[in-house]
Amino acid sequence: MSWSISSNQLNIENLLNEESLFFTGNGYIGVRGNFEEKYYDGASSIRGTYINAFHDITDINYGEKLYAFPETQQKLVNVIDAQTVQIYFGEEEERFSLFEGEVIQYERHLHMDKGFSERVIHWRSPGGKEVKLKFKRLTSFIYKELFIQEITIEPVNFFGKTKVVSTVNGDVSNFVDPSDPRVGSGHAKLLTVSDTVIEGDFVSIETKTKRSNLYAACTSTCRLNIDFQREYVKNEKSVETVLTFELTEKAIMTKINIYTDTLRHGDRPLRTGLDLCQKLSCLTFNDLKEQQKHYLDKFWLYADVEISGDQALQEGIRFNLFHLLQSAGRDRFSNIAAKGLSGEGYEGHYFWDTEIYMVPVFLMTNPELAKQLLIYRYSILDKARERAREMGHRKGALFPWRTISGGECSSYFPAGTAQYHISADIAYSYVQYYLVTKDLDFLKSYGAELLIETARLWMDTGHYHEGKFKIDAVTGPDEYTCIVNNNYYTNVMAKHNLRWAAKSVAELEKHAPDTLASLKAKLEITDEEIAEWIKAAEAMYLPYDPTLNINPQDDTFLQKQVWDFDNTPKEHYPLLLHYHPLTLYRYQVCKQADTVLAHFLLEDEQDESVIRDSYHYYEKITTHDSSLSSCVFSIMAAKIGELDKAYEYFIETARLDLDNTHGNTKDGLHMANMGGTWMAIVYGFAGLRIKESGLSLAPVIPKQWQSYRFSIQYLGRHISVSVDTKGTKVNLLNGEELTIKLYGKKHQLTKDEPLEITFNNGRVD
């Protein structure tokens, strides 16, 4: 049923990718799928364990630095390594390694319904000693600090002295690749070991970042199910626990690791972690596996998408949803990085990806988790205000293009700070959350203030010209076209932001007048200012070309030459690695969906013919060099009725990391694309939309499938949607009846009467 991904052969060329694919995490910590015993000398590996939002500060070096360029950036830190376990057999101490001796059997699995990974191995040493080994690991969703390993050693023809060396190592570095702008360069060594402690059966290491003054600690303890001797080897930066025993029967070693840091655990993370490890050390792997299964049963009840007709795509969608869950921050300090907790690509920064591509998944399947992701943005609102002032704005909030703790980390402003649309993207996500939940407390505590401050940014950025409100010198989502006037995406999202700032005031006036009075006083809001938001939204200039019947990406986009795609070698993609930015800026060539994305998010701003013609125009000139693109084109192809094309794009998005189609899975998984896979099904094939008027659906089914099914949460209801070649069925599984739109017509949905619509030759009459 595609609940696992597996690797059944040891492929040296794919080990780096598998480190990302088989990572385990829980939103707080992420552990790459490295081998406990490591590889061979000289082998490439990105050995990593990460704590969400745990970062250091590094300088940004410029050849020429101008006003308001960020001076420093935050960088996700590779923290203490507790994965390592070496095993030695016999008096001569033959070390277990998959790269020596003979591998008789090798299997590797990530169980997405149970929440753990394992390796199953049958190995013969160079000296002929034969054993079976099983390595299991689990990062707990119940105890966020806990990462547990279980190693089973079963004798086949060898019985005798065995030594297991478990290491906790604070001498770790970050991965760097100066040749790839998508990976960090320089600043590899970010941690220093501040303390090593052995207390009873527990070993601890505490480390400190160089400049952010954050501490991270790891406490570890090991136990065996048979008699053994224990000793310790304490070094300056690591501690080894050495377990020696006679292997006469199956031996099972359990290693419990607890991670803590100053952001969540105060100024004594080592002591806190040690106490917690002592408290949890009685837990077995099976105990935690059972708890993990219970947690995931609830997650999959709401989040699972079932596809009948394509096993590979079924595997892909579950894989993507599971890794999104493993990477989603659950506190005010954290969010979802571009690579989640699976790797160091983009240095662990949070982008607009979260709000536009990832929040929708949780919004419709786990609204409480979506809420936590949005609260993170509110927690850095003051820093966004500071950034706006730094950028010359008298009012408003400008959110950083890439960040961890709230400061701008982008050193290349044309494709960074200039992407002002991120503030409107966050506002859009806040509005979607409110429409799906009607959470008035959220609007009172977070939503209205953020919507108002982002609206103020547009009023100070834009200006009126010939009766239209225009926004100059910005960059839209397409990073091959920078610093333009009136980017369609930016303008239409700003329009939405301005409208909803005014609507949020109206909502509070109606439902929470006391809160509104306090907010008006705090932010010094006047009725005249609110009226200006409405006026600017109504006057917003949205570029339109009547000859082509499309929305131009910006004021000058159509004046440029079209890129010579026919004579661009395949090996020159992605273009950003082979052409100077100015070269790209001079042509009509898109890295990713821009105007097409705007037509998805705010489809009511244009009629169907403009959306269709724009899709066809931009499809010809979009490279999809960004992993954020294919899912959007899939959604919009489905909308305009081009199902075969929608399916082609969906295939690309569903297995992008599993098949490493972008060639950089080793640096971490593409989290936005993972959210996009779900969106391509639910927003694309099923046609789901959330608007002020309510929830609407218009499902279609690709000819390659027999059926598909998913469920959503909406206004406290649990709704399932099933689609097959015969038609569509919508069930209300829990909650009060409500009105929804199905294929453009209003229907009352009740528990007793599912809505069923029959297809006629694959279409609705």
UniProtKB/Swiss-Prot annotation:
EC number: 2.4.1.64
GO biological processes: trehalose catabolic process
Family recorded in the similarity comment: Belongs to the glycosyl hydrolase 65 family.
Top-rank lineage group of the source organism: Bacteria
Functional description taken from the UniProt entry: Catalyzes the reversible phosphorolytic cleavage of trehalose. Phosphorolysis is specific for trehalose.
Lineage start: Bacteria, Bacillati, Bacillota, Bacilli, Bacillales
Subunit structure: Homodimer.
Active site residues per record: E479 (proton donor)
Noted pH dependence of activity: Optimum pH is 7.0-8.0.
Keywords (A to Z) from UniProt: Glycosyltransferase, Transferase
Keyword Transferase assigned: yes
Organism: Geobacillus stearothermophilus (Bacillus stearothermophilus)
Gene of this entry: treP
Catalytic reaction annotation: alpha,alpha-trehalose + phosphate = beta-D-glucose 1-phosphate + D-glucose
Record field: temperature dependence: Optimum temperature is 75 degrees Celsius.
Pfam family, one: Glyco_hydro_65m
Pathway recorded for this protein: Glycan degradation; trehalose degradation
Cross-referenced InterPro entries: 6-hairpin_glycosidase_sf (IPR008928), 6hp_glycosidase-like_sf (IPR012341), Gal_mutarotase_sf_dom (IPR011013), Glyco_hydro_65_C (IPR005194), Glyco_hydro_65_M (IPR005195), Glyco_hydro_65_N (IPR005196), Glyco_hydro_65_N_sf (IPR037018), Malt_Pase/Glycosyl_Hdrlase (IPR017045)
Residues given in the record as substrate binding sites: W352, D353, K591, Q592
Keyword Transcription regulation among UniProt keywords: no
Annotated protein name in UniProt: Alpha,alpha-trehalose phosphorylase
